[in-house]
Amino acid sequence: MSQEILDQVRRRRTFAIISHPDAGKTTLTEKLLLFSGAIQSAGTVKGKKTGKFATSDWMDIEKQRGISVASSVMQFDYKDHTVNLLDTPGHQDFSEDTYRVLTAVDSALMVIDAAKGVEAQTIKLLNVCRLRNTPIVTFMNKYDREVRDSLELLDEVENILQIRCAPVTWPIGMGKNFKGVYHILNDEIYLFEAGGERLPHEFDIIKGIDNPELEQRFPLEIQQLRDEIELVQAASNEFNLDEFLAGELTPVFFGSAINNFGIQEILNSLIEWAPAPKPRDATVRMVEPDEPKFSGFIFKIQANMDPKHRDRIAFLRVCSGKFERGMKMKHLRINREIAASSVVTFMSHDRELVEEAYAGDIIGIPNHGNIQIGDSFSEGEQLTFTGIPFFAPELFRSVRIKNPLKIKQLQKGLQQLGEEGAVQVFKPMSGADLILGAVGVLQFEVVTSRLANEYGVEAVFDNASIWSARWVSCDDKKKLAEFEKANAGNLAIDAGGNLAYLAPNRVNLGLTQERWPDIVFHETREHSVKL
Protein backbone atom coordinates (compact mmCIF):
# COMPACT_ATOMS: atom_id res chain seq x y z
CA MET A 1 0.00 0.00 0.00
CA SER A 2 1.28 3.49 -0.77
CA GLN A 3 1.55 6.11 1.96
CA GLU A 4 -0.21 8.59 -0.37
CA ILE A 5 -3.32 6.37 -0.64
CA LEU A 6 -3.34 5.70 3.10
CA ASP A 7 -3.10 9.43 3.91
CA GLN A 8 -5.88 10.32 1.46
CA VAL A 9 -8.20 7.60 2.81
CA ARG A 10 -7.69 8.84 6.38
CA ARG A 11 -8.69 12.37 5.30
CA ARG A 12 -12.01 11.24 3.78
CA ARG A 13 -15.44 11.47 5.43
CA THR A 14 -18.45 10.32 3.40
CA PHE A 15 -21.88 10.76 4.97
CA ALA A 16 -25.55 11.21 4.09
CA ILE A 17 -28.14 13.44 5.73
CA ILE A 18 -31.40 11.64 6.53
CA SER A 19 -34.68 12.97 7.89
CA HIS A 20 -38.44 13.05 7.62
CA PRO A 21 -39.74 15.64 5.09
CA ASP A 22 -39.59 19.25 6.29
CA ALA A 23 -37.31 18.56 9.27
CA GLY A 24 -34.87 21.09 7.77
CA LYS A 25 -32.49 18.74 5.99
CA THR A 26 -31.92 20.76 2.82
CA THR A 27 -31.38 23.92 4.90
CA LEU A 28 -28.83 22.06 7.02
CA THR A 29 -27.05 20.81 3.88
CA GLU A 30 -26.75 24.39 2.65
CA LYS A 31 -25.44 25.62 5.99
CA LEU A 32 -22.81 22.87 6.20
CA LEU A 33 -21.56 24.03 2.79
CA LEU A 34 -21.66 27.65 3.94
CA PHE A 35 -19.69 26.93 7.12
CA SER A 36 -17.09 24.89 5.24
CA GLY A 37 -16.52 27.81 2.86
CA ALA A 38 -17.78 25.77 -0.11
CA ILE A 39 -20.47 28.35 -1.00
CA GLN A 40 -20.75 32.08 -0.33
CA SER A 41 -24.48 32.36 0.44
CA ALA A 42 -27.12 29.77 1.16
CA GLY A 43 -30.27 29.60 -0.95
CA THR A 44 -33.19 27.98 0.81
CA VAL A 45 -36.00 25.92 -0.68
CA LYS A 46 -38.63 27.93 1.17
CA GLY A 47 -37.74 31.18 -0.61
CA LYS A 48 -39.62 30.21 -3.75
CA LYS A 49 -40.74 33.74 -4.61
CA THR A 50 -37.17 35.03 -4.53
CA GLY A 51 -36.12 32.50 -7.16
CA LYS A 52 -33.23 31.56 -4.87
CA PHE A 53 -33.27 27.77 -4.90
CA ALA A 54 -31.19 25.55 -2.67
CA THR A 55 -27.89 24.37 -4.15
CA SER A 56 -28.83 20.74 -3.66
CA ASP A 57 -32.33 20.84 -5.25
CA TRP A 58 -31.81 20.97 -8.99
CA MET A 59 -34.39 19.11 -11.04
CA ASP A 60 -37.34 21.17 -12.37
CA ILE A 61 -39.90 19.30 -10.32
CA GLU A 62 -37.80 19.98 -7.20
CA LYS A 63 -37.66 23.69 -7.93
CA GLN A 64 -41.45 23.78 -8.33
CA ARG A 65 -42.20 21.84 -5.15
CA GLY A 66 -39.30 22.80 -2.87
CA ILE A 67 -38.41 19.20 -2.04
CA SER A 68 -35.26 17.17 -2.70
CA VAL A 69 -36.28 14.52 -5.22
CA ALA A 70 -32.94 13.28 -6.53
CA SER A 71 -29.99 12.69 -4.27
CA SER A 72 -27.27 15.24 -4.80
CA VAL A 73 -23.58 14.82 -4.10
CA MET A 74 -21.38 17.61 -2.81
CA GLN A 75 -17.65 17.49 -2.07
CA PHE A 76 -15.83 20.12 -0.02
CA ASP A 77 -12.70 20.52 2.11
CA TYR A 78 -12.86 21.31 5.82
CA LYS A 79 -10.07 21.28 8.43
CA ASP A 80 -7.64 19.38 6.18
CA HIS A 81 -10.27 16.73 5.39
CA THR A 82 -12.21 16.01 2.20
CA VAL A 83 -15.91 15.68 2.96
CA ASN A 84 -18.36 13.94 0.61
CA LEU A 85 -21.89 14.94 1.57
CA LEU A 86 -24.82 13.06 0.03
CA ASP A 87 -28.14 14.88 0.32
CA THR A 88 -30.93 12.31 0.16
CA PRO A 89 -34.54 12.84 -0.93
CA GLY A 90 -36.46 13.73 2.20
CA HIS A 91 -39.88 13.31 0.64
CA GLN A 92 -41.47 10.08 1.84
CA ASP A 93 -42.14 9.01 -1.72
CA PHE A 94 -38.49 8.76 -2.54
CA SER A 95 -37.34 6.28 0.01
CA GLU A 96 -35.91 3.73 -2.43
CA ASP A 97 -33.37 6.16 -3.87
CA THR A 98 -32.54 7.19 -0.32
CA TYR A 99 -32.02 3.56 0.73
CA ARG A 100 -29.52 3.07 -2.07
CA VAL A 101 -27.60 6.23 -1.22
CA LEU A 102 -27.16 4.83 2.29
CA THR A 103 -25.16 1.92 0.79
CA ALA A 104 -22.52 4.41 -0.42
CA VAL A 105 -21.76 6.22 2.87
CA ASP A 106 -19.73 5.48 5.99
CA SER A 107 -21.88 7.49 8.44
CA ALA A 108 -25.16 9.43 8.54
CA LEU A 109 -26.44 12.67 10.04
CA MET A 110 -30.03 12.31 11.26
CA VAL A 111 -32.06 15.54 11.42
CA ILE A 112 -35.12 15.60 13.70
CA ASP A 113 -37.71 18.39 13.85
CA ALA A 114 -37.74 19.01 17.61
CA ALA A 115 -41.37 20.17 17.49
CA LYS A 116 -42.47 16.82 16.05
CA GLY A 117 -39.96 14.24 17.27
CA VAL A 118 -39.33 10.91 15.55
CA GLU A 119 -41.43 10.53 12.38
CA ALA A 120 -42.21 7.64 10.03
CA GLN A 121 -39.57 8.27 7.37
CA THR A 122 -36.84 8.62 10.00
CA ILE A 123 -37.73 5.16 11.34
CA LYS A 124 -37.51 3.56 7.87
CA LEU A 125 -34.19 5.22 7.07
CA LEU A 126 -32.65 4.32 10.39
CA ASN A 127 -33.62 0.69 9.81
CA VAL A 128 -31.65 0.75 6.53
CA CYS A 129 -28.66 2.28 8.35
CA ARG A 130 -28.94 -0.50 10.90
CA LEU A 131 -28.52 -3.16 8.19
CA ARG A 132 -24.91 -1.97 7.90
CA ASN A 133 -24.42 -0.69 11.49
CA THR A 134 -23.84 2.81 10.08
CA PRO A 135 -22.72 5.31 12.75
CA ILE A 136 -25.34 8.07 13.28
CA VAL A 137 -24.92 11.67 14.48
CA THR A 138 -28.24 13.30 15.56
CA PHE A 139 -29.24 16.97 15.19
CA MET A 140 -32.36 18.21 16.98
CA ASN A 141 -33.41 21.14 14.78
CA LYS A 142 -35.67 24.21 15.05
CA TYR A 143 -34.93 25.29 18.64
CA ASP A 144 -35.66 28.88 17.59
CA ARG A 145 -39.33 27.75 17.66
CA GLU A 146 -41.52 26.21 20.34
CA VAL A 147 -40.44 22.56 20.53
CA ARG A 148 -40.99 19.49 22.70
CA ASP A 149 -39.19 18.75 25.95
CA SER A 150 -35.57 17.80 25.21
CA LEU A 151 -35.46 14.82 27.61
CA GLU A 152 -38.69 13.55 26.08
CA LEU A 153 -37.09 13.74 22.60
CA LEU A 154 -34.09 11.69 23.77
CA ASP A 155 -36.43 9.08 25.28
CA GLU A 156 -38.35 8.88 22.02
CA VAL A 157 -35.19 8.34 19.95
CA GLU A 158 -34.03 5.62 22.33
CA ASN A 159 -37.39 3.82 22.51
CA ILE A 160 -38.55 4.08 18.90
CA LEU A 161 -35.24 3.98 17.03
CA GLN A 162 -33.56 1.63 19.50
CA ILE A 163 -30.30 3.57 19.59
CA ARG A 164 -28.81 5.02 22.78
CA CYS A 165 -28.38 8.81 22.95
CA ALA A 166 -25.35 10.70 24.28
CA PRO A 167 -26.10 14.45 24.44
CA VAL A 168 -23.02 16.47 23.43
CA THR A 169 -24.73 19.86 23.55
CA TRP A 170 -27.82 20.85 25.56
CA PRO A 171 -30.32 23.64 24.75
CA ILE A 172 -30.91 26.66 26.97
CA GLY A 173 -34.60 27.49 26.50
CA MET A 174 -36.51 27.37 23.21
CA GLY A 175 -38.50 29.58 20.84
CA LYS A 176 -38.37 33.27 21.78
CA ASN A 177 -36.43 32.33 24.93
CA PHE A 178 -33.79 30.24 23.14
CA LYS A 179 -30.48 31.50 24.58
CA GLY A 180 -28.02 29.00 23.10
CA VAL A 181 -26.50 25.62 23.94
CA TYR A 182 -24.14 24.24 26.56
CA HIS A 183 -21.38 22.00 25.14
CA ILE A 184 -21.15 19.25 27.76
CA LEU A 185 -17.75 17.88 26.67
CA ASN A 186 -16.07 21.29 26.27
CA ASP A 187 -17.80 22.99 29.25
CA GLU A 188 -18.66 25.99 27.04
CA ILE A 189 -21.84 27.95 26.42
CA TYR A 190 -22.53 29.15 22.85
CA LEU A 191 -24.87 32.14 22.83
CA PHE A 192 -27.65 32.22 20.25
CA GLU A 193 -28.55 35.22 18.11
CA ALA A 194 -31.12 34.97 15.33
CA GLY A 195 -30.06 35.64 11.74
CA GLY A 196 -29.29 33.35 8.82
CA GLU A 197 -26.06 34.96 7.66
CA ARG A 198 -23.93 34.55 10.79
CA LEU A 199 -20.76 32.49 10.57
CA PRO A 200 -19.25 30.42 13.43
CA HIS A 201 -16.77 33.03 14.67
CA GLU A 202 -19.69 35.47 15.10
CA PHE A 203 -21.34 33.53 17.97
CA ASP A 204 -20.19 34.45 21.49
CA ILE A 205 -18.77 31.73 23.74
CA ILE A 206 -18.69 31.76 27.56
CA LYS A 207 -16.32 29.29 29.22
CA GLY A 208 -17.62 27.23 32.15
CA ILE A 209 -21.15 26.48 33.38
CA ASP A 210 -20.26 28.10 36.75
CA ASN A 211 -19.07 31.35 35.15
CA PRO A 212 -20.65 34.33 37.06
CA GLU A 213 -21.20 36.12 33.72
CA LEU A 214 -24.05 33.67 33.06
CA GLU A 215 -26.11 35.02 35.98
CA GLN A 216 -25.93 38.47 34.42
CA ARG A 217 -26.71 37.25 30.89
CA PHE A 218 -29.75 35.09 31.71
CA PRO A 219 -30.50 34.84 35.44
CA LEU A 220 -33.80 32.99 34.90
CA GLU A 221 -32.51 30.22 32.64
CA ILE A 222 -29.09 29.45 34.12
CA GLN A 223 -30.30 27.61 37.25
CA GLN A 224 -32.69 25.54 35.15
CA LEU A 225 -29.79 24.67 32.81
CA ARG A 226 -27.60 23.57 35.72
CA ASP A 227 -30.41 21.39 37.11
CA GLU A 228 -31.06 19.85 33.68
CA ILE A 229 -27.36 19.14 33.07
CA GLU A 230 -27.14 17.39 36.44
CA LEU A 231 -30.15 15.28 35.48
CA VAL A 232 -28.83 14.57 31.96
CA GLN A 233 -25.41 13.53 33.23
CA ALA A 234 -27.00 11.18 35.76
CA ALA A 235 -29.65 9.71 33.48
CA SER A 236 -28.20 9.57 29.96
CA ASN A 237 -25.17 7.98 28.31
CA GLU A 238 -21.69 9.42 28.08
CA PHE A 239 -20.29 9.66 24.57
CA ASN A 240 -18.23 6.55 23.71
CA LEU A 241 -16.40 6.47 20.36
CA ASP A 242 -16.39 2.66 19.95
CA GLU A 243 -20.13 2.43 20.63
CA PHE A 244 -20.77 5.25 18.13
CA LEU A 245 -18.66 3.51 15.44
CA ALA A 246 -20.60 0.27 16.05
CA GLY A 247 -23.89 2.10 15.38
CA GLU A 248 -25.10 1.52 18.96
CA LEU A 249 -24.93 5.08 20.32
CA THR A 250 -25.63 8.46 18.71
CA PRO A 251 -24.12 11.79 19.82
CA VAL A 252 -26.94 14.38 19.99
CA PHE A 253 -26.62 18.09 19.11
CA PHE A 254 -29.27 20.83 19.44
CA GLY A 255 -29.67 24.01 17.37
CA SER A 256 -31.36 25.93 14.58
CA ALA A 257 -30.15 25.27 11.03
CA ILE A 258 -31.96 28.26 9.54
CA ASN A 259 -30.04 30.53 11.95
CA ASN A 260 -26.69 28.76 11.34
CA PHE A 261 -26.67 27.73 15.00
CA GLY A 262 -25.23 24.35 16.02
CA ILE A 263 -23.75 23.68 12.57
CA GLN A 264 -20.09 24.11 13.53
CA GLU A 265 -20.32 21.48 16.28
CA ILE A 266 -21.84 18.93 13.89
CA LEU A 267 -19.14 19.48 11.26
CA ASN A 268 -16.42 19.16 13.88
CA SER A 269 -17.91 15.94 15.25
CA LEU A 270 -18.12 14.37 11.79
CA ILE A 271 -14.45 15.20 11.16
CA GLU A 272 -13.31 14.05 14.59
CA TRP A 273 -15.48 10.99 15.22
CA ALA A 274 -17.04 9.70 11.98
CA PRO A 275 -15.10 6.85 10.35
CA ALA A 276 -12.83 7.15 7.34
CA PRO A 277 -13.84 4.83 4.43
CA LYS A 278 -14.32 1.27 5.60
CA PRO A 279 -13.62 -2.11 3.92
CA ARG A 280 -16.41 -3.25 1.56
CA ASP A 281 -17.82 -6.72 0.94
CA ALA A 282 -17.45 -8.17 -2.55
CA THR A 283 -18.48 -11.65 -3.71
CA VAL A 284 -14.91 -12.98 -3.71
CA ARG A 285 -13.33 -11.16 -0.74
CA MET A 286 -13.31 -8.08 1.48
CA VAL A 287 -11.84 -5.02 -0.27
CA GLU A 288 -9.68 -2.71 1.88
CA PRO A 289 -9.83 1.06 1.11
CA ASP A 290 -6.05 1.52 1.11
CA GLU A 291 -5.33 -1.22 -1.46
CA PRO A 292 -3.25 0.09 -4.39
CA LYS A 293 -5.71 -0.92 -7.15
CA PHE A 294 -8.84 1.08 -7.96
CA SER A 295 -12.32 -0.41 -7.50
CA GLY A 296 -15.85 0.92 -6.96
CA PHE A 297 -19.58 0.35 -7.49
CA ILE A 298 -22.51 2.26 -8.99
CA PHE A 299 -25.22 3.15 -6.47
CA LYS A 300 -27.30 5.56 -8.55
CA ILE A 301 -27.92 6.63 -12.14
CA GLN A 302 -29.30 10.08 -12.84
CA ALA A 303 -30.66 11.02 -16.24
CA ASN A 304 -30.40 14.54 -17.62
CA MET A 305 -28.70 16.23 -14.71
CA ASP A 306 -28.01 19.12 -17.00
CA PRO A 307 -30.83 20.07 -19.39
CA LYS A 308 -28.16 21.54 -21.69
CA HIS A 309 -26.41 18.18 -21.96
CA ARG A 310 -29.30 15.68 -21.99
CA ASP A 311 -26.96 13.11 -20.53
CA ARG A 312 -27.00 10.43 -17.85
CA ILE A 313 -24.46 10.17 -15.09
CA ALA A 314 -23.66 6.99 -13.15
CA PHE A 315 -22.61 7.76 -9.56
CA LEU A 316 -19.71 5.57 -8.44
CA ARG A 317 -18.47 5.16 -4.87
CA VAL A 318 -14.71 4.56 -4.93
CA CYS A 319 -13.94 1.59 -2.64
CA SER A 320 -10.17 1.22 -3.00
CA GLY A 321 -7.02 2.52 -4.65
CA LYS A 322 -6.65 5.70 -6.64
CA PHE A 323 -8.72 6.82 -9.61
CA GLU A 324 -6.83 8.92 -12.18
CA ARG A 325 -8.38 10.62 -15.17
CA GLY A 326 -7.78 8.72 -18.40
CA MET A 327 -6.98 5.43 -16.62
CA LYS A 328 -8.35 2.20 -18.04
CA MET A 329 -10.96 0.55 -15.85
CA LYS A 330 -13.00 -2.58 -16.38
CA HIS A 331 -16.81 -2.62 -16.36
CA LEU A 332 -17.09 -6.12 -14.90
CA ARG A 333 -20.71 -7.08 -15.68
CA ILE A 334 -20.20 -6.67 -19.43
CA ASN A 335 -16.44 -7.41 -19.30
CA ARG A 336 -15.57 -4.23 -21.18
CA GLU A 337 -12.66 -1.87 -20.63
CA ILE A 338 -13.37 1.85 -20.65
CA ALA A 339 -11.04 4.84 -20.67
CA ALA A 340 -12.26 7.18 -17.96
CA SER A 341 -11.44 10.55 -19.46
CA SER A 342 -14.59 12.62 -18.81
CA VAL A 343 -15.38 11.57 -15.24
CA VAL A 344 -16.80 14.39 -13.07
CA THR A 345 -17.06 15.38 -9.43
CA PHE A 346 -19.99 17.38 -8.07
CA MET A 347 -21.11 20.42 -6.20
CA SER A 348 -24.76 19.55 -6.80
CA HIS A 349 -25.32 20.48 -10.49
CA ASP A 350 -21.96 22.24 -10.88
CA ARG A 351 -19.48 19.75 -12.22
CA GLU A 352 -15.73 19.64 -12.52
CA LEU A 353 -13.58 17.08 -14.28
CA VAL A 354 -11.90 14.73 -11.83
CA GLU A 355 -8.14 14.39 -11.95
CA GLU A 356 -7.97 11.88 -9.09
CA ALA A 357 -10.21 10.27 -6.46
CA TYR A 358 -9.74 7.93 -3.51
CA ALA A 359 -11.86 5.56 -1.41
CA GLY A 360 -14.95 7.35 -0.09
CA ASP A 361 -15.12 9.79 -3.01
CA ILE A 362 -18.14 9.84 -5.31
CA ILE A 363 -17.42 10.31 -9.02
CA GLY A 364 -19.77 10.60 -11.99
CA ILE A 365 -19.25 8.51 -15.11
CA PRO A 366 -21.08 9.57 -18.30
CA ASN A 367 -23.39 6.70 -19.15
CA HIS A 368 -24.75 5.99 -22.61
CA GLY A 369 -26.97 3.15 -21.48
CA ASN A 370 -24.48 0.38 -20.60
CA ILE A 371 -24.13 1.05 -16.88
CA GLN A 372 -26.69 -0.19 -14.35
CA ILE A 373 -27.15 0.32 -10.61
CA GLY A 374 -25.01 -2.17 -8.70
CA ASP A 375 -22.37 -2.52 -11.45
CA SER A 376 -18.79 -2.89 -10.22
CA PHE A 377 -15.62 -1.44 -11.76
CA SER A 378 -11.99 -2.39 -11.13
CA GLU A 379 -8.57 -2.39 -12.77
CA GLY A 380 -9.26 -5.96 -13.92
CA GLU A 381 -9.99 -8.11 -10.85
CA GLN A 382 -13.41 -9.79 -10.92
CA LEU A 383 -14.92 -8.00 -7.92
CA THR A 384 -18.69 -7.71 -7.58
CA PHE A 385 -19.63 -5.54 -4.60
CA THR A 386 -22.67 -6.66 -2.63
CA GLY A 387 -25.28 -4.92 -0.50
CA ILE A 388 -27.08 -2.69 -3.04
CA PRO A 389 -30.76 -3.68 -2.82
CA PHE A 390 -33.96 -3.18 -4.80
CA PHE A 391 -36.96 -3.00 -2.44
CA ALA A 392 -40.38 -4.48 -3.24
CA PRO A 393 -42.63 -1.63 -4.48
CA GLU A 394 -45.83 -0.80 -2.62
CA LEU A 395 -47.81 1.03 -5.34
CA PHE A 396 -48.50 -0.05 -8.91
CA ARG A 397 -49.79 1.59 -12.10
CA SER A 398 -50.35 0.36 -15.64
CA VAL A 399 -49.16 2.70 -18.43
CA ARG A 400 -50.91 3.87 -21.60
CA ILE A 401 -49.88 6.57 -24.05
CA LYS A 402 -52.09 9.11 -25.78
CA ASN A 403 -50.16 8.86 -29.06
CA PRO A 404 -49.59 5.21 -30.10
CA LEU A 405 -46.86 6.33 -32.55
CA LYS A 406 -44.66 7.20 -29.57
CA ILE A 407 -44.50 3.66 -28.17
CA LYS A 408 -40.74 3.43 -28.86
CA GLN A 409 -40.03 6.66 -26.97
CA LEU A 410 -42.16 5.36 -24.07
CA GLN A 411 -40.25 2.08 -23.95
CA LYS A 412 -36.89 3.88 -24.12
CA GLY A 413 -37.93 6.36 -21.43
CA LEU A 414 -39.21 3.68 -19.05
CA GLN A 415 -36.14 1.51 -19.69
CA GLN A 416 -33.85 4.43 -18.74
CA LEU A 417 -35.93 5.53 -15.75
CA GLY A 418 -36.07 1.89 -14.61
CA GLU A 419 -32.29 1.49 -14.80
CA GLU A 420 -31.86 4.78 -12.99
CA GLY A 421 -34.09 3.47 -10.20
CA ALA A 422 -36.61 6.31 -10.49
CA VAL A 423 -39.31 3.64 -10.81
CA GLN A 424 -39.47 -0.14 -11.19
CA VAL A 425 -40.73 -1.45 -14.51
CA PHE A 426 -42.44 -4.84 -14.90
CA LYS A 427 -43.46 -6.50 -18.18
CA PRO A 428 -46.32 -8.94 -17.46
CA MET A 429 -45.96 -12.37 -19.07
CA SER A 430 -49.56 -12.08 -20.23
CA GLY A 431 -50.96 -8.67 -21.24
CA ALA A 432 -49.46 -5.81 -23.21
CA ASP A 433 -49.43 -2.93 -20.70
CA LEU A 434 -46.24 -2.29 -18.77
CA ILE A 435 -46.63 -2.08 -14.98
CA LEU A 436 -44.76 0.49 -12.92
CA GLY A 437 -43.94 -0.08 -9.26
CA ALA A 438 -42.98 2.61 -6.75
CA VAL A 439 -42.84 3.27 -3.03
CA GLY A 440 -44.85 6.51 -3.19
CA VAL A 441 -47.33 8.37 -5.42
CA LEU A 442 -45.01 11.27 -6.13
CA GLN A 443 -42.66 8.91 -7.97
CA PHE A 444 -45.35 8.44 -10.65
CA GLU A 445 -45.73 12.22 -10.96
CA VAL A 446 -41.98 12.53 -11.46
CA VAL A 447 -42.06 9.82 -14.15
CA THR A 448 -44.99 11.53 -15.93
CA SER A 449 -43.17 14.86 -15.86
CA ARG A 450 -39.85 13.39 -17.03
CA LEU A 451 -41.44 11.32 -19.82
CA ALA A 452 -43.05 14.53 -21.12
CA ASN A 453 -39.99 16.80 -20.72
CA GLU A 454 -37.21 14.42 -21.68
CA TYR A 455 -38.81 11.94 -24.09
CA GLY A 456 -41.77 13.90 -25.50
CA VAL A 457 -44.27 11.26 -24.37
CA GLU A 458 -47.67 11.95 -22.77
CA ALA A 459 -48.37 8.93 -20.58
CA VAL A 460 -51.52 8.05 -18.66
CA PHE A 461 -51.27 5.91 -15.52
CA ASP A 462 -54.16 3.74 -14.34
CA ASN A 463 -54.42 2.00 -10.98
CA ALA A 464 -53.29 -1.60 -11.28
CA SER A 465 -54.97 -4.13 -9.00
CA ILE A 466 -51.70 -5.30 -7.47
CA TRP A 467 -50.99 -5.28 -3.73
CA SER A 468 -47.28 -6.14 -3.72
CA ALA A 469 -44.48 -7.74 -5.71
CA ARG A 470 -42.04 -10.49 -4.74
CA TRP A 471 -39.09 -11.65 -6.79
CA VAL A 472 -39.12 -15.43 -7.13
CA SER A 473 -36.40 -18.04 -7.50
CA CYS A 474 -36.02 -21.80 -7.16
CA ASP A 475 -33.00 -24.10 -7.41
CA ASP A 476 -35.16 -26.79 -9.01
CA LYS A 477 -35.71 -25.68 -12.63
CA LYS A 478 -38.56 -28.16 -13.13
CA LYS A 479 -40.52 -26.86 -10.13
CA LEU A 480 -39.92 -23.26 -11.27
CA ALA A 481 -41.31 -24.12 -14.74
CA GLU A 482 -44.42 -25.68 -13.11
CA PHE A 483 -44.86 -22.56 -10.97
CA GLU A 484 -44.54 -20.30 -14.05
CA LYS A 485 -47.13 -22.32 -15.96
CA ALA A 486 -49.64 -22.34 -13.09
CA ASN A 487 -49.25 -18.63 -12.27
CA ALA A 488 -48.60 -17.01 -15.67
CA GLY A 489 -51.34 -14.41 -15.08
CA ASN A 490 -49.51 -13.02 -12.02
CA LEU A 491 -45.93 -13.12 -13.29
CA ALA A 492 -43.81 -10.39 -14.84
CA ILE A 493 -40.19 -9.72 -15.80
CA ASP A 494 -38.48 -6.67 -14.29
CA ALA A 495 -35.95 -4.32 -15.94
CA GLY A 496 -33.09 -6.57 -14.79
CA GLY A 497 -34.63 -9.67 -16.40
CA ASN A 498 -35.78 -11.16 -13.06
CA LEU A 499 -39.03 -13.03 -12.55
CA ALA A 500 -41.49 -11.36 -10.16
CA TYR A 501 -44.84 -12.46 -8.72
CA LEU A 502 -47.42 -9.62 -8.65
CA ALA A 503 -49.87 -10.41 -5.85
CA PRO A 504 -53.38 -8.87 -6.03
CA ASN A 505 -53.73 -8.96 -2.21
CA ARG A 506 -52.10 -10.17 0.99
CA VAL A 507 -54.23 -13.34 1.20
CA ASN A 508 -53.31 -14.36 -2.35
CA LEU A 509 -49.61 -13.97 -1.62
CA GLY A 510 -49.88 -16.02 1.59
CA LEU A 511 -51.79 -18.84 -0.14
CA THR A 512 -49.38 -18.90 -3.10
CA GLN A 513 -46.40 -19.16 -0.75
CA GLU A 514 -48.09 -22.04 1.11
CA ARG A 515 -48.98 -23.81 -2.13
CA TRP A 516 -45.44 -23.55 -3.53
CA PRO A 517 -43.07 -24.22 -0.59
CA ASP A 518 -40.04 -24.80 -2.87
CA ILE A 519 -40.30 -21.35 -4.46
CA VAL A 520 -38.44 -18.55 -2.63
CA PHE A 521 -40.31 -15.20 -2.53
CA HIS A 522 -37.88 -12.27 -2.04
CA GLU A 523 -38.83 -8.82 -0.63
CA THR A 524 -35.54 -7.37 -1.85
CA ARG A 525 -33.10 -8.32 -4.54
CA GLU A 526 -29.49 -7.39 -5.10
CA HIS A 527 -28.71 -5.06 -7.96
CA SER A 528 -26.60 -6.64 -10.69
CA VAL A 529 -27.24 -10.12 -9.29
CA LYS A 530 -29.73 -12.20 -11.23
CA LEU A 531 -31.93 -14.41 -9.06
Curated annotation (Swiss-Prot):
Residues annotated for GTP binding in this entry: 19-26, 87-91, 141-144
InterPro entries given in the database record: EF-G-like_DII, EFG_III/V, G_TR_CS, P-loop_NTPase, PrfC, RF3_C, RF3_dom_3_sf, RF3_GTP-bd
Record's GO cellular component terms: cytosol
Keyword Transmembrane included in the entry's annotation: no
Cellular compartment(s): Cytoplasm
Biological-process GO terms, alphabetical: regulation of translational termination
Cross-referenced CDD domains: RF3, RF3_II, RF3_III
Pfam families: EF-G_D2 (PF22042), GTP_EFTU (PF00009), RF3_C (PF16658)
GO molecular function: GTP binding; GTPase activity; translation release factor activity, codon nonspecific; translation release factor activity, codon specific
Domain tr-type G: 10-278
Keyword presence, Glycosyltransferase: no
Sorted UniProt keywords: Cytoplasm, GTP-binding, Nucleotide-binding, Protein biosynthesis
Gene3D superfamilies assigned to the protein according to its UniProt record, in alphabetical order: P-loop containing nucleotide triphosphate hydrolases, Peptide chain release factor 3, domain III
NCBIfam families, sorted: prfC, PRK00741.1, small_GTP
Family assignment from sequence similarity: Belongs to the TRAFAC class translation factor GTPase superfamily. Classic translation factor GTPase family. PrfC subfamily.
Task of the protein: Increases the formation of ribosomal termination complexes and stimulates activities of RF-1 and RF-2. It binds guanine nucleotides and has strong preference for UGA stop codons. It may interact directly with the ribosome. The stimulation of RF-1 and RF-2 is significantly reduced by GTP and GDP, but not by GMP.
Name of the protein in its database record: Peptide chain release factor 3
Gene this chain is encoded by: prfC
